[in-house]
From Swiss-Prot:
Molecular function as annotated in GO: haptoglobin binding; heme binding; iron ion binding; organic acid binding; oxygen binding; oxygen carrier activity; peroxidase activity
Superkingdom field: Eukaryota
Positions of O2 binding: 59
Tissue: Red blood cells.
Role of this protein: Involved in oxygen transport from the lung to the various peripheral tissues.
Gene name tied to this protein: HBAA
Protein name in UniProt: Hemoglobin subunit alpha-A
Annotated PANTHER family: HEMOGLOBIN FAMILY MEMBER, HEMOGLOBIN SUBUNIT ALPHA
Amino acid sequence: MVLSAADKTNVKGVFSKIGGHAEEYGAETLERMFIAYPQTKTYFPHFDLSHGSAQIKAHGKKVAAALVEAVNHIDDIAGALSKLSDLHAQKLRVDPVNFKFLGHCFLVVVAIHHPAALTPEVHASLDKFLCAVGAVLTAKYR
């Protein structure tokens, strides 16, 4: 998925508003995904999936860090997330549809916390970005 210059500007703008809340939003995204799409819990059988658990917060921090890394390298998302792509494809074997679920839940979290920032244009750009991240994370699946 090709991001236009406007898309890149919009995505960077949203992430500048997220700022120091990225880890919190990552955990909130996971909690929302586990509730809205309970089948995603199967990849985390060893986690305490209760609200506010340390494990969800820690994994939310990883999710947020990956998204920030992708934003910081928006012109080379594949290069920035190559190791993460290998991990998900070869070791974790996460069903690719789950990245769409995660992206949707992240959009909802952004909309809740920054409704004014999520104009239709920004929404479209952020959706394209999250789809691009998902495509990178599933590119090495066979």
